[in-house]
Regions:
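Sec-dependent bacterial lipoprotein signal peptides
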Residues: 1-30
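Acidic, polar-rich low-complexity tracts and alpha-helical solenoid repeat scaffolds
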Residues: 7-9, 26-258
Length: 258
């Protein structure tokens, strides 16, 4: 009441000025709110697509969030959900991308593009693979995702790239076993090397490192003075690749053991 009385005690030109400022602020706020709400779901989706295309990812995410909040039951929300996951994937935010692709598969399991969400969820795991790390959780998760994908979506347009990624995942896992076995061999832990390299032969018999693995098995047994086993692996190397450098070395070992 005191403020109101103070206002009326001011000269009329000041009162008019304050009223004018108040009304301008009021209408400006209403106008902004009105403009924000004036965008339809389809407009918000188009805007977010354009922003994403122009590499304005954060603004695109904001538009999608507005779409989700203002139009929770719209058909555009479905496309917005996929677009949000795609933006995270494009920005190499693979944990976030994986989360949103998973969410899409849960919310829209019968959608015509649900196979795409499953594929890119597995791709997100694949992208999280750090070849320099010993943590193989992401590549194992990716492998599982791609294998399940080809079972669930045998007619998908993503079938071929999914199979290619399975091969890459298997290569990474095989290479990991091989490198560990090779490390044990180099450090003189021959029994540990033998265990790893034998596991490689059993689990990945057609891998590109198999020939070298067989040679290192022969070398490991040779250094353990288990000459019968060493001989068997050297002969296998010569038989499988007679002109290779490993075969050349194997022949020298066999000659030395006579």
């Amino acid at each position: 009441e005191g403020v109101l009385m103070s206002l009326f005690s001011l000269p009329s030109k000041f009162v008019s000025f304050f009223i004018l400022v108040f009304l301008l602020a009021l209408f400006s706020g209403c106008s902004t709110t009105k403009n924000e709400k004036n965008y339809s779901a389809s407009q918000l989706l188009r805007q977010s697509k354009k922003l994403s295309k122009n590499d304005e990812s954060e603004k695109a995410k904001t538009k999608i969030q507005q779409l989700m909040e203002d139009y929770p039951d719209s058909k555009e929300r479905v496309a917005g959900s996929m677009l949000l996951a795609d933006i995270h994937f494009k920005e190499e935010e693979y944990e976030e991308a994986k989360f949103h692709y998973q969410k899409f598969t849960e919310l829209y399991p019968a959608h015509q593009f649900v196979d795409r969400a499953h594929f890119y969820k597995a791709m997100s795991n694949f992208k999280l693979t750090d070849l320099a790390s010993r943590d193989l959780t992401p590549v194992n998760s990716a492998l599982e995702g791609f294998q399940r994908f080809i079972e669930d979506f045998p007619k998908s347009s993503y079938l071929k790239p999914a199979k290619e990624k399975i091969t890459q995942c298997l290569d990474i896992l095989a290479q990991n076993i091989f490198e560990i076995g090779k490390f044990y061999y180099r450090t003189g832990s021959y029994q540990a090397a033998i265990l790893r390299l034998k596991r490689l032969k059993v689990e990945y018999p057609n891998h590109s490192y198999i020939l070298e693995a067989e040679f290192l098995l022969g070398e490991s047994y040779y250094r353990e003075q288990n000459f019968p086993e060493a001989t068997a692996y050297y002969k296998s190397v010569i038989k499988n690749s007679p002109r290779s450098e490993f075969a050349k070395e194997a022949r020298l070992r066999l000659k030395a053991m006579r």
